[in-house]
UniProtKB/Swiss-Prot annotation:
Name listed for the protein in its UniProt record: Elongator complex protein 2
Keywords of the record: Cytoplasm, Disease variant, Intellectual disability, Nucleus, Repeat, tRNA processing, WD repeat
Domain notes per entry: Folds into a two seven-bladed beta-propeller structure which is required for elongator complex assembly.
Pfam families linked: WD40
Biological role stated in the UniProt entry: Component of the elongator complex which is required for multiple tRNA modifications, including mcm5U (5-methoxycarbonylmethyl uridine), mcm5s2U (5-methoxycarbonylmethyl-2-thiouridine), and ncm5U (5-carbamoylmethyl uridine). The elongator complex catalyzes the formation of carboxymethyluridine in the wobble base at position 34 in tRNAs.
Quaternary data: Component of the elongator complex which consists of ELP1, ELP2, ELP3, ELP4, ELP5 and ELP6. Interacts with STAT3 and JAKs.
Length: 826
C-alpha cells in the first residue's frame, strides 16, 4: 500500500458548549461523537485518538445522535443538527464517511435531534425515522429510505419550543411514539397514526423547562426519564392498560393514570402512563438524563435498569433501584472540584456501562471508568481535550518536543506526546495549561524551551517560565531524562504557580511556601472561617497526562515579567532564532500606534520603536540569519528592517528601514495576513486576503545602500481563496525547492513547492503538491501554520527511505491539528 502524501496524525478539540452535542455509539468499541464548532468529531476513547472529522455543517453543531441498532451491533449512522438550520444524516463505513444527506426545511437553528430505525408492515425494508426541533418553534419528522428523504410532518408549537426529543415504539407494537420536552414545563407525547403523529398526552409535574427526555424498554413496559431546570428527575411508566372488567375498589389509593388509545393493525389498544418515581439529588438545573443502553453479554441481550444524570451543580449521578425495595437510590456521584467551572451540560454511558463521560460547561470532557474489582469505585480516565473557542496562535518549542497554543477561550495550552514503554503508538495530550487569563489571548512566542511571552486583548505582554513541577512531569510523560533537561535551567526554579485571592497574575510558589502550609487539623483549629487559602498549588509527579481538574489548578506557569509600551490591544509577537530580541505590535488606526517595539529578552527593556505602517501590523518574522525583520500590515504593505552591523550605543536604533512597498508597488490589494522566510534568508513570502501568495527577494544582508527596491521574484500564486496563514518548511524538497504551506479562510491547507526559474517574467515556478481532504481540513479560517524543527525526536521511526515533515495548524474552528507530510512523495 502506498503511503499517503499528507496525513493528520493528531487532533486536539473539545465539544461545543451546548446541550446534546455529545453521544456515545452503542455496540462493542463504540465511538464517541461530539460537535466541535462546525464539525462532527468521531473519537475512539480506548485508543485515545480522533478517528475522523465529518465536515458538512456551515455553522455550529448543536446536537448529535447515533442511530441504535436493535441487535446491539455497532452503530453506523448518525444525525446532527446545527445553527445553519439543517439536519445532516451521516453514514459511516470503516470509521470513514460514506455518505451525507442534508435535510433542509427549518427556519432556525436546530438544537435537538433523534432517530430510530422503523419497520413497516407494508414494507419489509427498514426506513429511518428522524425528528428534529429548531428555534422556529417547529418539530419536523422525516423519513429516510435509501437516498430519498421525505418530510412527513411539521409539529408547530406556536410561541413555545421543544427543547428535548426522543423516539421509541409502543410496547408490543411497531407504532412510533415521540416525547417532546418543552419550555411550558410539560412533556408532550405524540403517537403515529396513519403516517401522521397525533398528540395523545401531556405529562405535567415539572415546574421549569424540560431539558432532557429519554425512553427505555424494560420487558413489556416503556419507561420515560425526564429532567428539568427544577432540579428534579421524573421517571414515567407507560404500559398496556388491562382490559379486564374486574371491579376495582374505589377506596384504594392508586397512582393517577393518563390513558390513551392507539389503533395498531385494526386493533385498538389502550395504554396508560403513571409517574413511577421522582429523583431529587441535584442542587441545580438537571441538563441531561440517559438510560444505560442495551448490550449483549455472552450472547444474551442485557438491559440494566440504570440511569445517568448530569447537572449544573458540577455532579453526575448514577441511579438504580434497590434490589429488595425497588426504591431508586443514588449509586455513584462523580464530578469536578475547583477551578472556574459551572457544571455539566451532558452525560453518556459507554456500550456496557463500564465507563461514563460528562461534558462540562467550558467544553471539557470528564471520563470515569468502573473498577473491575470494586464496582462501586470509579476512577478518572484520560480523554481528549482542547480549546472551546477559536485558536489564534501556536508555536513549536525549539526542539520540536511540544506545542503551545493560545485562543479566545482565554487559555494557553501545552500539548506533548505521551510515550509508554509497553506501547509503540504515541498519542498527544494536553499536559499543562500555563495561563488562564481574563482577556481573549491573541498571540505568543517562545523565548526559550521553557519560557514564552503571550499577548491578549490588553496593552500588556506577559512572560511566563516553566516551574520545576512541570519540567518533572514533562520528562516523565514524554520519556526524557530529567537531569538532561534540568541542566539547562536555573537552580532556583519555583515549584509551581497559583493566582492570589485578590490578584490577577500567576504568582510563583517555592518549596518553602508549600512546606509552610498547615495540616488540615491545624487549619481547622486556627482558621476563623474567612481566610482564603493563598497557595492552591500542590506538586504532584505524573506518569500519564493529567485530568481536567489537575489542568485547571496545578499546571499554571509563574508570570515573571510584564512588558508595558503599547497603547492598544496586542496583536502579534515574534522572537528571533537566538532568542535575544522580541518584537511586538498592537492594534492601530494611526501611524504612531502601529509602531513595532523591540525588547531585550535579558533585561526586558525596550530597545527600539520601528515606525512605518499606518494600520495594524498583522504578523512579523525575523529572518533565520537574524539580519532582517519583516512586518506585514492591514495597510496592504510590508516593511523590511535590517539589523545594523556596528555595535550601537544602548539608546541608538538597532534596526533601520531597508525596503518597503507602498500602494503603488504593493502587489496585494487587501490586508496581508501572513508572512514567512525561506530557510536560507534569501526570500520572504506574503499571503493576503486577495487570494495571492507572493515571493519577494533576494535580500542581501551585505548590501549597505540606503535605498532598496525589493520586488516580487515569483509569479503571483492565486490559491482560490483568502489566504490567512503562510509557513515555509525549514527543510528543502529533495529537488532543492522550497516547501510552502498555505492556510485559507475556508479552512483548507494547500502545500506548494517553489523555486526561482530566472525567467522574465517568472513562469512555472510554483508547483501544487497536495491539499487537505474535507475531513482533514479545518471548517473555519486557519489562524496559524507552523512547521516543526525537523529533528524527528518525538515521532516513531518510520520505515527506511520515508522521511516525514511535521507541521501544526490551528483555526477559528476551535481545533489544533498536527499533520505529517511525506517529503519524498511531494
Amino acid at each position: 500500500m502506498v503511503a499517503p502524501v499528507l496525513e493528520t496524525s493528531h487532533v486536539f478539540c473539545c465539544p461545543n458548549r451546548v446541550r446534546g452535542v455529545l453521544n456515545w455509539s452503542s455496540g462493542p468499541r463504540g465511538l464517541l461523537a461530539f460537535g466541535t464548532s462546525c464539525s462532527v468529531v468521531l473519537y475512539d476513547p480506548l485508543k485515545r485518538v480522533v478517528v475522523t472529522n465529518l465536515n458538512g455543517h456551515t455553522a455550529r453543531v448543536n446536537c448529535i445522535q447515533w442511530i441504535c441498532k436493535q441487535d446491539g451491533s455497532p452503530s453506523t449512522e448518525l444525525v446532527s443538527g446545527g445553527s445553519d438550520n439543517q439536519v445532516i444524516h451521516w453514514e459511516i463505513e470503516d470509521n470513514q464517511l460514506l455518505k451525507a444527506v442534508h435535510l433542509q426545511g427549518h427556519e432556525g437553528p436546530v438544537y435537538a435531534v433523534h432517530a430510530v430505525y422503523q419497520r413497516r408492515t407494508s414494507d419489509p425494508a427498514l426506513c429511518t425515522l428522524i425528528v428534529s426541533a429548531a428555534a422556529d418553534s417547529a418539530v419536523r419528522l422525516w423519513s429516510k429510505k435509501g437516498p430519498e428523504v421525505m418530510c412527513l410532518q411539521t409539529l408547530n408549537f406556536g410561541n413555545g419550543f421543544a427543547l428535548a426529543l426522543c423516539l421509541s415504539f409502543l410496547p408490543n407494537t411497531d407504532v412510533p411514539i415521540l416525547a417532546c420536552g418543552n419550555d411550558d414545563c410539560r412533556i408532550h407525547i405524540f403517537a403515529q397514526q396513519n403516517d401522521q403523529f397525533q398528540k395523545v398526552l401531556s405529562l405535567c409535574g415539572h415546574e421549569d423547562w424540560i431539558r432532557g427526555v429519554e425512553w427505555a424498554a424494560f420487558g413489556r413496559d416503556l419507561f420515560l426519564a425526564s429532567c428539568s431546570q427544577d432540579c428534579l428527575i421524573r421517571i414515567w411508566k407507560l404500559y398496556i392498560k388491562s382490559t379486564s372488567l374486574e371491579t376495582q375498589d374505589d377506596d384504594n389509593i392508586r397512582l393517577k393514570e393518563n390513558t390513551f388509545t392507539i389503533e395498531n393493525e385494526s386493533v385498538k389498544i389502550a395504554f396508560a402512563v403513571t409517574l413511577e418515581t421522582v429523583l431529587a439529588g441535584h442542587e441545580n438545573w438537571v441538563n441531561a438524563v440517559h438510560w444505560q443502553p442495551v448490550f449483549y453479554k455472552d450472547g444474551v441481550l442485557q438491559q440494566p435498569v440504570r440511569l445517568l444524570s448530569a447537572s449544573m451543580d458540577k455532579t453526575m449521578i448514577l441511579w438504580a433501584p434497590d434490589e429488595e425495595s425497588g426504591v431508586w437510590l443514588e449509586q455513584v456521584r462523580v464530578g469536578e472540584v475547583g477551578g472556574n467551572t459551572l457544571g455539566f451540560y451532558d452525560c453518556q454511558f459507554n456500550e456496557d456501562g463500564s465507563m461514563i463521560i460528562a461534558h462540562a460547561f467550558h467544553g471539557a470532557l470528564h471520563l470515569w471508568k468502573q473498577n473491575t474489582v470494586n464496582p462501586r469505585e470509579w476512577t478518572p480516565e484520560i480523554v481528549i481535550s482542547g480549546h472551546f473557542d477559536g485558536v489564534q496562535d501556536l508555536v513549536w518549542d525549539p526542539e520540536g518536543e511540544f506545542i503551545i497554543t493560545v485562543g479566545t477561550d482565554q487559555t494557553t495550552r501545552l500539548f506533548a506526546p505521551w510515550k509508554r514503554k509497553d506501547q509503540s503508538q504515541v498519542t498527544w495530550h494536553e499536559i499543562a495549561r500555563p495561563q488562564i487569563h481574563g482577556y481573549d489571548l491573541k498571540c505568543l512566542a517562545m523565548i526559550n524551551r521553557f519560557q514564552f511571552v503571550s499577548g491578549a486583548d490588553e496593552k500588556v505582554l506577559r512572560v511566563f517560565s516553566a516551574p520545576r513541577n512541570f519540567v518533572e512531569n514533562f520528562c516523565a510523560i514524554t520519556g526524557q531524562s530529567l537531569n538532561h533537561v534540568l541542566c539547562n535551567q536555573d537552580s532556583d526554579l519555583p515549584e509551581g504557580a497559583t493566582v492570589p485571592a485578590l490578584g490577577l497574575s500567576n504568582k510563583a510558589v517555592f518549596q518553602g511556601d508549600i512546606a509552610s502550609q498547615p495540616s488540615d487539623e491545624e487549619e481547622l483549629l486556627t482558621s476563623t472561617g474567612f481566610e482564603y487559602q493563598q497557595v492552591a498549588f500542590q506538586p504532584s509527579i505524573l506518569t500519564e497526562p493529567p485530568t481536567e481538574d489537575h489542568l485547571l489548578q496545578n499546571t499554571l506557569w509563574p508570570e515573571v515579567q510584564k512588558l508595558y509600551g503599547h497603547g492598544y490591544e496586542i496583536f502579534c509577537v515574534t522572537c528571533n532564532s537566538s532568542k535575544t530580541l522580541l518584537a511586538s505590535a498592537c492594534k492601530a488606526a494611526k501611524k504612531e500606534h502601529a509602531a513595532i517595539i523591540l525588547w531585550n529578552t535579558t533585561s526586558w527593556k525596550q530597545v527600539q520603536n520601528l515606525v512605518f505602517h499606518s494600520l495594524t501590523v498583522t504578523q512579523m518574522a525575523f529572518s533565520p540569519n537574524e539580519k532582517f525583520l519583516l512586518a506585514v500590515s492591514r495597510d496592504r504593505t510590508w516593511s523590511l528592517w535590517k539589523k545594523q552591523d556596528t555595535i550601537s550605543p544602548e539608546f541608538e536604533p538597532v534596526f533601520s528601514l531597508f525596503a518597503f512597498t507602498n500602494k503603488i508597488t504593493s502587489v496585494h490589494s487587501r490586508i496581508i495576513w501572513s508572512c514567512d522566510w525561506s530557510p536560507d534568508s534569501k526570500y520572504f513570502f506574503t499571503g493576503s486576503r486577495d487570494k495571492k501568495v507572493v515571493v519577494w527577494g533576494e535580500c542581501d544582508s551585505t548590501d549597505d545602500c540606503i535605498e532598496h527596491n525589493i520586488g516580487p521574484c515569483s509569479s503571483v500564486l492565486d490559491v482560490g481563496g483568502a489566504v490567512t496563514a503562510v509557513s515555509v518548511c525549514p527543510v528543502l524538497h529533495p529537488s532543492q525547492r522550497y516547501v510552502v504551506a498555505v492556510g485559507l479562510e475556508c479552512g483548507k491547507i494547500c502545500l506548494y513547492t517553489w523555486k526561482k526559474t530566472d525567467q522574465v517574467p517568472e513562469i512555472n515556478d510554483w508547483t501544487h503538491c497536495v491539499e487537505t481532504s474535507q475531513s482533514q481540513s479545518h471548517t473555519l479560517a486557519i489562524r496559524k501554520l507552523c512547521w516543526k524543527n525537523c529533528s524527528g525526536k518525538t515521532e516513531q521511526k518510520e520505515a527506511e527511505g520515508a522521511e516525514w515533515l511535521h507541521f501544526a495548524s490551528c483555526g477559528e474552528d476551535h481545533t489544533v491539528k498536527i499533520h505529517r507530510v511525506n517529503k519524498c512523495a511531494l
